[in-house]
């Protein structure tokens, strides 16, 4: 067996903004066309964008405007953009994370490719990976890194 020639991880640039909004009063994460995560002191993380072509970590005005427009469609209160962050997230071709061990490296465990849904799926995926390692329970086929093997 050998691992497929396709790349396991595909870089995907994402940007988010940080807003100040004393009026918002959100106490838990909201996920719609954007995520809104309460931080502290009326600050919120809002995002994110997707860009498979640009692999820089430079913020862009286009991404900022896109998020502001989407945010205005979701909330009905004033806010001020106080920061913007860009980074590269790991994604996979089939948009599924990969978890588990390679056949030849049982002592190396993978937990990657979560992409944009990672923020909401990481807790349950971590539980699945824990049960795989500690309790010998199988990982779901669609998330098992072994799906990349050619038999």
What are the roles of these predicted feature ranges?
Residues 1-106:
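Active-site substrate-recognition segment that forms the wall
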Residues 79-151:
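C-terminal catalytic lobe of FAD-dependent flavoproteins
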């Amino acid at each position: 067996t050998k691992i497929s020639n396709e790349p396991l991880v595909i870089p995907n640039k994402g940007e988010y903004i940080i807003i100040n909004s004393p009026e918002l009063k959100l106490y838990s994460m909201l996920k719609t066309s954007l995520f809104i995560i309460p931080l502290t002191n009326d600050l919120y993380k809002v995002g994110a964008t997707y860009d498979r072509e640009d692999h820089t970590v430079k913020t862009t005005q286009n991404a900022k405007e896109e998020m502001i427009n989407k945010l205005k469609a979701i909330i009905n209160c004033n806010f001020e953009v106080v920061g913007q962050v860009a980074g590269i997230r790991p994604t996979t071709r089939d948009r599924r994370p990969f978890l588990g061990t390679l056949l030849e490296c049982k002592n190396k465990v993978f937990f990657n490719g979560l992409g944009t849904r990672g923020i909401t799926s990481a807790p349950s995926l971590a539980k699945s990976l824990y049960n795989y390692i500690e309790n010998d329970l199988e990982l779901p086929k669609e998330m098992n890194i072994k799906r990349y093997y050619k038999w």
